[in-house]
Amino acid sequence: ADDKRPALASPADVILYEMHHRDMSIDPSSGIEHKGKFLALTEQGTVSPDKLATGIDHLKELGITHVHLLPSYDYASVDETKLDKAQYNWGYDPQNYNVPDGSYSTDPYKPDVRIREFKQMVQALHKAGIRVVLDVVYNHTFNTDESNFERTVPGYFYRQTKDGQWANGSGCGNETASDRAMMRKYMIESILYWINEYHIDGFRFDLMGIHDIETMNEIRAAIDKIDPSIFMYGEGWAASSPQLEADRLAMKANVEKMPRIAAFSDEMRDGLRGGWDDDTKGAFLVGEPGHEMSIKFGIVGAIEHPQVISDSVNYSKKPWALQPTQMISYVSCHDDMCLADRLKATMPDASVEELAALQKLAETFVFTSQGVPFIFAGDEMMRDKKGVHNSYNSPDSINTIDWKNKTAHKDVFEYVKGLIAMRKAHPAFRMGDADMVRRQLEFLPVENTNVVAFILKDNANGDSWKNIIVALNSRAEPVKLDIPSGKYTVICKDGKINMKGLGQVSGDELMVPARSAMIIHQ
């Protein structure tokens, strides 16, 4: 009864942190008692061997606003009766949508335990000022013929191909039919149940492109009656073409038909790190030219902007968001290699210091973008997965977050923490309004490839800083930039960030060091 949603003034203020329950706490270095359980996030005062905060205290220290929990409903791939055996899965294989998974509870045999412990976790996060996002996978189920849906009304809840086969837009054996009245009703009621019963504050829709636009908008409308601040976003794609007309699908290209629902920008992600299909091929971050426009597309939040020429953007040849808060800005997530592994794969000869510098540069793009920033748990301390590309069922040894990394890469952690603090303190970085972004975010002319620079001008969005210049350089050498003449305070340089200032620069030229970002203001 005393559980309150932490305040959220605008979707532009959202900062997402994506985590898996086991990854977060299973390592001995977490210092957490309830390892791999919902209760792990209720433990305060937990520390690593070097006495640095872990778990929920780490999240508070980092400053994120929302924890995005990988699937936490009851999924099929982990056998709750055999928890003494090593089992791991992300959980994208739904069995029962409306109850927490027992493997994350302290006693899967007592039905009330998982429910109570999940609620304790939500309550603890809320008390810590953090909202909770549930990853929902209504697009397919683990079983088809033996599923609850098929047993209820055979042939109704799943789409079929013309020749009567199960359609497979999910790549997992089936795809549900959200366009049918009772599947739509099921999804809406399930979402409302998680909100009312478990106080969930947001939803991330797996393969949202399989669902239809009308269902997504009806979910948004139903949520708005309870609390419009509950955040909705999803993957604006499918694994293969769903059995429904393209103009009805909740794909990225149709986001403009879904107000206040956001989608991930793979344009920005792959413009920074390279495509998902070849881990050894890098992009902007490793100094490959030609990705600048895809990144500018991400910086403005996938909206129309006079300086973003959409023809040169990868994947999308036109802006797809009406508002910047409809775009999720990110460089890595649970899928594919995590950022540290990807950088290593694309730059095998780079030193640890060089890789750390690029990790910082990548996160600077994410947290200075007008989209909604998203970070994969552990990227703030160069977490790795030993090079595994798809770790959905890899053992803990691959997936766990080693909290000793927080000591080894303290500078990366402090830098990301600094970026988040700057974003929260300065509304210019989160305008949340497309017209304002077009008016007050201007890209500066650059002579080189692999350099992107922009100015947030005239106290953008009521900011106390009059003009803010963000310059991002992935070249192996420093670059000279022409800037509006004046005296500026340096906030970020050489992989350090300090809002009180790191010194002054004046004149109409700026030297931006190699493989790093520079942020100055007046």
Placement of each model-derived feature along the sequence:
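Hydrophobic faces of well-ordered beta-strands that scaffold small-molecule active sites
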Residues: 15-17, 67, 132-134, 203, ...
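A solvent-exposed, charged loop/short amphipathic helix patch at secondary-structure junctions
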Residues: 29-48, 342-352, 356, 395-397
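Short, flexible loop/turn elements at secondary-structure junctions
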Residues: 20-25, 63, 71-73, 96, ...
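Substrate-binding/active-site clefts of carbohydrate-active enzymes
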Residues: 22-198, 211-227, 231, 243
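Conserved alpha/beta catalytic core and glycan-binding cleft of carbohydrate-active enzymes
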Residues: 220-221, 229-382, 392, 448, ...
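Non-transmembrane alpha-helical segments in soluble domains
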Residues: 56-61, 122, 191-195, 220, ...
